[in-house]
Amino acid sequence: MNYANFGLDFLNSVANAAVEGKKLDLASRGLQLRSRALDTERDFNYAKLAFERHKFDTNNDLRIYGDAMRIQALRAAGLRINPYSNGRQIYQDEADLANLHSYYSFYKTD
């Protein structure tokens, strides 16, 4: 048995083990970064879906209940055209004004 070769082989195996350990460490860090990037992308996509759902629900509510909601908001703000109104019914002129207001506030952008 050649002790010089044994020592060189031993040092070579230790160096190879250190190199392989470093490769594994770098690979695990790469996987961690990739996993973190995928988690971030997933969270972003979930947030985007939640925002799109909220926007759809809001637009759907405005499409269905929009005029009634706007009239309620105008009534709550104290808008009363008819001085004889008791506050429990909406007259046609109030509905017309509410629709005109909704047209200019929600559909006109300039």
UniProtKB/Swiss-Prot annotation:
Keyword rRNA-binding listed? The answer is no
What's one Pfam family here? Vesi_VP2
Q: Which domain of life is it from?
A: Viruses
Q: Where in the cell is it found?
A: Virion; Host cytoplasm
* GO annotation, cellular component aspect: host cell cytoplasm; viral capsid, decoration
Please provide the record's keywords in A-Z order.
Capsid decoration protein, Capsid protein, Host cytoplasm, Virion
List the InterPro entries hit by this protein, alphabetically: Vesivirus_VP2
Q: What is known of its domains?
A: The N-terminus domain points away from the virion surface.
Its assembly, as annotated, is:
Homooligomer. The portal-like structure consists in 12 copies of VP2. Interacts with capsid protein VP1.
What additional remark is attached to this entry? Answer: Translated by a ribosomal termination-reinitiation process from the bicistronic mRNA coding for VP1 and VP2.
Record's family? Answer: Belongs to the vesivirus VP2 protein family.
What the protein does comes down to: Minor structural protein that forms a portal-like structure at a unique three-fold axis of symmetry, following binding to the host receptor. The channel formed by VP2 may allow the delivery of the viral genome through the host endosomal membrane.
Q: What is the name listed in the Swiss-Prot or TrEMBL entry for this protein?
A: Minor capsid protein VP2
Q: Which organism is it from?
A: Vesicular exanthema of swine virus serotype A48 (isolate Swine/United States/A48/1948) (VESV)
